[in-house]
Amino acid sequence: MHTGGETSACKPSSVRLAPSFSFHAAGLQMAAQMPHSHQYSDRRQPSISDQQVSALPYSDQIQQPLTNQVMPDIVMLQRRMPQTFRDPATAPLRKLSVDLIKTYKHINEVYYAKKKRRHQQGQGDDSSHKKERKVYNDGYDDDNYDYIVKNGEKWMDRYEIDSLIGKGSFGQVVKAYDRVEQEWVAIKIIKNKKAFLNQAQIEVRLLELMNKHDTEMKYYIVHLKRHFMFRNHLCLVFEMLSYNLYDLLRNTNFRGVSLNLTRKFAQQMCTALLFLATPELSIIHCDLKPENILLCNPKRSAIKIVDFGSSCQLGQRIYQYIQSRFYRSPEVLLGMPYDLAIDMWSLGCILVEMHTGEPLFSGANEVDQMNKIVEVLGIPPAHILDQAPKARKFFEKLPDGTWSLKKTKDGKREYKPPGTRKLHNILGVETGGPGGRRAGESGHTVADYLKFKDLILRMLDYDPKTRIQPYYALQHSFFKKTADEGTNTSNSVSTSPAMEQSQSSGTTSSTSSSSGGSSGTSNSGRARSDPTHQHRHSGGHFAAAVQAMDCETHSPQVRQQFPAPLGWSGTEAPTQVTVETHPVQETTFHVAPQQNALHHHHGNSSHHHHHHHHHHHHHGQQALGNRTRPRVYNSPTNSSSTQDSMEVGHSHHSMTSLSSSTTSSSTSSSSTGNQGNQAYQNRPVAANTLDFGQNGAMDVNLTVYSNPRQETGIAGHPTYQFSANTGPAHYMTEGHLAMRQGADREESPMTGVCVQQSPVASS
C-alpha cells in the first residue's frame, strides 16, 4: 500500500515526463518519415541536435534513449498500415446499422438451412412414418449414401450440374460444365461411405499413375482431370465421352457391328492392355465389358476404357469376387489366383459379342456361366481343375483322374455336350457371318473369319499362362495385310502406340495412357453379376445419324526395334527371342510357348477342335439374367443397314510390307548367352503349323519351341528380351512407317444408320 508521501513524490515526475515524451514522439514521427532513418544508422537525426539535448532539462535528456527505442516500433506500425481498404458496404459498422435488416435475414438463412433441407427431404414421405424419417449428411444424401443431385446446382463457383448420366454401386456420374476450363466434364460422385471412399482413393491413385505415364493420352484410357471433396463426397472429374459399346449394340438391334469395326475396337483394346501391363503399372482392370468401353465421339471409332473402380495392381489383389459374370474368367470362377490375363479373357468375350450382337457366355449364375463356357470350349484341363479351390462346385473328378461336369440339381437347364457348340458356327465362318447377315460383304470372307476365330480362341485359352498376351495379340494376322485388300481396314500390318516404343534396358520406355475411372457410365438395365451394378436409364435419348467414324490420334514413326513384351504371372516364355526377317517374308504373329490344343491346326478334320457346320438356333427370346435380349430375325433387307463399320483414319498405325506375295514366318526362342537363335532350332515343335491358305489369304507357319528356363522380373512376371536381326525388315520401310493416305480410305458403310445416343456430350 502506497503512502501519501510516495504518491506526491511521483506526481511531479509524471507531470513533467508526459509533455517531453509527446514532444520526442512527434519528433520521432517526423524522423521516421525521412529516408535512411534507422535505429542503427550512422547519420545523425536532424530533428534533435546535441546542443538542443544539452539545453533541455535533465529529465528531458534522459528520455533520449527511450526515443531511439520507440522509433523502430513506429516504423513497423506504419509499414503494417493497409494499402487497400475493403468495400464500405461490407464494413461491420454498416452491417450493424443501415444494413441491420439484411444481416438478420442472412443469419436466419444460415441458421435454418439444415431444417429446411430436412423438411424438403421428408415432404414425399407418408405422414405416418414421420418419426422414422432420417436425415443423411445434413440432408444432402439419400438413404443409399448417394448425393442428391439437383440440376442447375453450382459447386464451388465452378461446376454447373446439368444432369445425372449414370449410376452404379460406386455412386453416380453427372454431366457438368466447368466454368474455369469452359468445357463439359463428367463428375463421378462417390458414395458417402468409408468403404467406397477407400476404394475410390485406390482408383484415383491408379488413374494418376496412368496419367503420369501417358502425357499424350494416346493409350485409350479415360483421362482423370482432377478430384476434390464436396459435402463429404469424393468427386472425380473426367473428360466427357460419348455413349458406350453396349449402347452401340442396342442401336443395331443386337445384330452386331461389322468385322472391320470389331477389328478397330480389338486393336485399341489390345493396345490399352499392353499399356496396363507395363512393369511400372501392372494394372488389372477387373471389370472389362461393353458398358465400360466408351466412344470418344459418336462419329468416330476411337474408344477409351473407363471405370477403374474395381482395379488393382498385380500383387495387391484384395477381392476374389470380381468381373461381371458374362465376362468372368475361368480362374476367377474357380477361385484361383488371377493376374492380368483375366482382362484378355474379358476382351475375347467382348469382341465376339460386338460382332454377333449377343453375349458369348450369358450365364444366369456362376454354375450356368461355367456350363456355357464348357459348351463352347470343353472341359478345362485337369492340371487347372486339380489346383482350383472351387472346382467341385462345377465339376466332379472321376476315378481315372479326369473331370466331368456335375449334373444340375434342378435339371431344368440342358446343355450341349462339352465343346460341341463351336465358335466356328457362332461366328458363321463359312455361312456368311452371324445368322448369315454378312454374306457377300467386303471384309467378311472365310479367311477373315478364320483369323478372327483363331485370335478369339487364343484369348479364351483356359490356361492363363498360355493365354495370348497383348504384345502377341497385336501381331496376329487378324490385324495384318492380306492378299485381299477388302478384308482389312488398313493396307498393312497394324501397330499400336504401345508397340512403337523402343526397347531400353529390357523394358519399354513408354509414355503411357491415362485416365480411368468411370465417366459417362452406362445407363442400361443390363444383367450383371452384382445386382448393385444396375444402371438406370436416364431420359432424353436422341437420335444421331452416324455417317463415318474415324479415329484421330498421333502418327509417330515406328522404330525397327520392338519393346519387350510384358508377361503375365507364371507365363513360360523365352528369355530372348530373335525375330528372323527376310526380304520376301511378312511377319505374322507370335504365340506364347506351349499353346494348348485350342491353338492347333483348324483345317485338320481329325482334330478335336475342327468345327463342324452346326447352326446355333435361338429359341424365342433368350433371357439374359435380368434382361431379355430381342430375337434377331435374319432379314436380308436389314443386312446392309446394320453395318456399323466405322472408318479409322490414321489412328492405328501400320507397317507396310515390302512384299505382297503369300509368305510365312517363324518365331524361334533361344536362351541367353552367345548362342543366339541357334540354341533351340532343333527342339521339337510344340505347336502345329496353322494354315490359313483359303481365298487368297496368306499361309501362316507357327513354330513354337519350349523353353528350359524362365527369368522372372517383378511380381512373378517373366522377363522378355526381343531383338530384330540387322538385315532388312520385311514388314517396314527404311526407318519409317508408310502411312496410309486419306485417298485410300474405304467408304464407310455406316452412312444412314440411325444411332440412339445416351445424353452424354462428346468431347
UniProtKB/Swiss-Prot annotation:
Residues that bear Phosphotyrosine: Y111, Y140, Y145, Y159, Y177, Y219, Y319, Y321, Y449
All copies of domain Protein kinase, residue ranges: 159-479
Protein residues bound to ATP: I165, G166, K167, G168, S169, F170, G171, Q172, V173, K188, F238, E239, M240, L241
CDD domains (UniProt xref): PKc_DYRK1 (cd14226)
Tissue expression as described in the entry: Detected in brain (at protein level). Expressed in a variety of embryonic and adult tissues. Expressed abundantly in neurons of the brain, spinal cord, and retina in developing embryos. Expressed in the entorhinal, temporal and visual cortices and the hippocampus of the brain where is colocalizes with SEPTIN4. Expressed and extensively colocalizes with SEPTIN4 in apical dendrites of pyramidal cells. Also expressed in Purkinje cells in the cerebellum in postnatal day 1 and adult mice.
Reactions catalysed according to its record: L-seryl-[protein] + ATP = O-phospho-L-seryl-[protein] + ADP + H(+); L-threonyl-[protein] + ATP = O-phospho-L-threonyl-[protein] + ADP + H(+); L-tyrosyl-[protein] + ATP = O-phospho-L-tyrosyl-[protein] + ADP + H(+); [DNA-directed RNA polymerase] + ATP = phospho-[DNA-directed RNA polymerase] + ADP + H(+)
Biased composition (Basic residues): 598-620
GO (cellular component) term, any one: centrosome
UniProt short sequence motif Bipartite nuclear localization signal, positions renumbered to this chain: 117-134
SUPFAM superfamilies: Protein kinase-like (PK-like)
Residues bearing PTM Phosphoserine: S14, S310, S529, S538, S748, S758
Active site: residue positions: D287 (proton acceptor)
Keywords carried by this UniProt record: ATP-binding, Kinase, Nucleotide-binding, Nucleus, Phosphoprotein, Serine/threonine-protein kinase, Transcription, Transcription regulation, Transferase, Tyrosine-protein kinase
One GO-annotated biological process of the protein: negative regulation of mRNA splicing, via spliceosome
Protein's cellular compartments: Nucleus speckle
Biased composition (Low complexity): 502-525, 654-672
Regulation: Inhibited by RANBP9.
Molecular function, one GO term: protein serine/threonine/tyrosine kinase activity
Family to which this protein belongs: Belongs to the protein kinase superfamily. CMGC Ser/Thr protein kinase family. MNB/DYRK subfamily.
Main function: Dual-specificity kinase which possesses both serine/threonine and tyrosine kinase activities. Plays an important role in double-strand breaks (DSBs) repair following DNA damage. Mechanistically, phosphorylates RNF169 and increases its ability to block accumulation of TP53BP1 at the DSB sites thereby promoting homologous recombination repair (HRR).
Subunit details: Interacts with RANBP9. Interacts with RAD54L2/ARIP4. Interacts with WDR68. Interacts with CRY2. Interacts with SIRT1.
Protein name: Dual specificity tyrosine-phosphorylation-regulated kinase 1A
Protein species of origin: Mus musculus
Source species taxonomy: Eukaryota, Metazoa, Chordata, Craniata, Vertebrata
Gene that produces this protein: Dyrk1a
